[in-house]
Design a protein with these regions (language model features):
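Short beta-alpha junction loops
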Residues: 35, 66, 106-109, 137-144
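A phosphate-binding catalytic loop at a beta-strand-loop-alpha-helix junction
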Residues: 101-118
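Short catalytic/ligand-binding loop motif for oxyanion handling, primarily in non-cytosolic enzymes
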Residues: 38-39, 69-70, 109-114
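Glycine-rich, flexible N-terminal cofactor/catalytic loop recognition
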Residues: 1-62
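PTP/DSP superfamily signal
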Residues: 91-100, 119-171
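Lipid deacylating catalytic domains
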Residues: 50-60, 81-82, 163, 167-170
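Helix-loop module immediately N-terminal to the HCX5R catalytic loop
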Residues: 58-102
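A structural signal for well-ordered alpha-helical segments within the folded catalytic domains
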Residues: 80, 84, 113-117, 121
Length: 171
């Protein structure tokens, strides 16, 4: 299964184009949006693709901040409910003929990388080793920017996708 992780800007640059139409016709999309953060005056992040695709069956939109700790009441953390939504979306769409997943968050480096990592492990089982058995340096060599991956997102999704056979501790 092909998994592609991109920044939000990738979709913004293609909004309303034939390429956007092709992507939504051939891939399943997981869109991670940053919710508002009133204390900093941050508005709700807009979904970066055309209106016609926002409620498509091959699109899932989730909203949570790119943080691993609840440091004030306005922070929306990834939680088990969101992990369930992602898992159920993948279960529902994996046989729809699209054959690939595209995941985005604001920068395409932390939340979406964690989702892409788990999907890759679940679909492709690369490298013949479970991810919880990889040393940090091995992991970084295999997956690139590991130090930017949101470990809360990774842990919740690994636990949801791999169940009780694999309980992942934070990186």
């Amino acid at each position: 299964m092909r998994i592609r992780v991109v920044p939000r800007k990738w979709f913004l640059d293609r909004r309303g184009t034939d390429e956007e139409k092709m992507v939504f016709g051939t891939m399943n999309i997981i869109s991670i949006i940053t919710p508002p953060y009133p204390k900093d005056g941050f508005e709700d992040e807009d979904i970066p693709f055309s209106e016609e695709y926002r409620n498509a069956g091959n699109v899932l939109v989730v909203k949570f901040h790119d943080t691993e700790k609840q440091w004030n009441d306005d922070v929306v953390l990834m939680n088990e409910s969101e992990a369930d939504r992602i898992y159920e979306f993948v279960q529902r769409t994996m046989d729809n003929g699209n054959g690939a997943y595209m995941v985005h968050c604001t920068a395409g480096k932390s939340r979406s990388q964690a989702v892409g990592y788990v999907l890759n492990e679940w679909f492709n089982g690369k490298h013949g080793v479970r991810p919880d058995q990889l040393a940090y340096d091995e992991y970084e060599g295999l997956y690139g920017q590991s130090r930017t991956m949101n470990s809360l997102v990774r842990r919740l999704l690994m636990n949801r996708f791999f169940g009780d056979s694999l309980k992942v501790a934070p990186l």
